[in-house]
Amino acid sequence: MRDYLKNNDISIKDGTDVNSIMRDMMSVLLEGALDEELDEELGYSKYDYRNKETDNSRNGHSRKTMHTSYGDMDVAIPRDRNGEYEPQLIKKYQNAVTQDMEEKILSMYAKGMTTGDIESHMRELYDIDISDSTISRITDKILPIVKEWQERPLEEVYAVVFMDAIHYHVRSEGRIVKRAVYIALGIDMNGKKDVLGMYVGENESAKFWLSIMNGLKNRGVEDILIACVDGLNGFPQAIEAVYPKTEIQQCIIHQIRNSTKFVSYKDIKKLMADLKLVYAAPTEETALNELELFKDKWDSKYPKIYKSWHDNWATLSTYFKYPEAVRRLIYTTNAIEGFNRQLRKVTKSKTVFPSDDSLLKMLYLATMDITKKWTGHRQDWGQIHSQLEIYFEERLIGRNL
């Protein structure tokens, strides 16, 4: 697959060329299905001459240009020596992949369908019988494309990188285990969002995050101005080792949820009003004063709330140093939480994934579908950009932005 990408001048550079990626994925699936279709026609698979019971044989491929809503794509159509094979998936005079066919093919991946579901799908749509093991081999061809995407070059500087985790169950060595998929979503200096990477792991640690940070560095990221996280274990140490100047903002909304989840119903409204005086304060000095007042009022009943805010204040209070527009950008991890919600919509019917690879394939394709709509930038980006240039002037001088 890597050779295929190089030979056809397909290079995944910045994650935005979604149409090219979609065409390539459709081409891979169609060509795999056509080869399997010819196998069934001849009664034996390629190079399996022991089971050959016909005088007919394969005779290379012909190229056919198919029109799709993602643009034109070349498909290699297999031929037989006797000229008896008539492809059913792509008819002889068909030169367009219909919208329905495109959606069905891509939905087999992006909706996390099982190989059995896809087998039924192909039979229902095209009256083609393909075994689930064959479908697995075909879908596995997408993995090198995922690897290319994970290793693509990135921007030199990101204004903000959001880090979060989403959890799934995966079958591993006969057991069902919990896997965390760690997602890095960046906003570059032009205000454009991009998913920088998705990483499947078992648990958070400084070593794990260090490998991710080094990976971003190796892909060309020289600086991250601000990193927004949800209290991820080991992350502050890892990013300090690779990007020592990056400022860390812990998600305020997560902090509120985590610190108030055991507050009684009768107290929650008044307590939240007092807590809002802390995180919505105009300055850090005012916020600290309000935090002490909160302690005086509530510490006897809910001592863990003050302690949690006090212990994490260094990363919770970062946003106070920025102007209002930048505060709104980093105040919460809403940008990545919204993306995660869309992923969950796709995966909600899949309780257990058969492997890490199947999980990553599905998330990648869902990501391609979601991010194709990310064509613009925030409406207030002009104001944010101006403020970032002033605040981070020394770090941005000489950068190729």
Label each PLM-derived region with a short phrase:
Residues 226-233, 238-274:
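Conserved beta-strand -> loop -> alpha-helix junction used to position metal-binding or nucleic-acid-contacting
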Residues 86, 259-287, 293:
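Metal-dependent DNA phosphodiester-chemistry modules and their immediately adjacent helices/loops
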Residues 45-48, 52-53, 113-160:
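Electropositive nucleic-acid engagement tracts
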Residues 244, 277-401:
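Acidic/histidine-rich catalytic cores and adjacent linkers
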Residues 53-111, 127-140, 156, 206:
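Basic, short loop/linker segments at the boundary and entry of helix-turn-helix/winged-helix-like folds
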Residues 78-81, 89-93, 128, 141-229, ...:
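RNase H-like nuclease fold core
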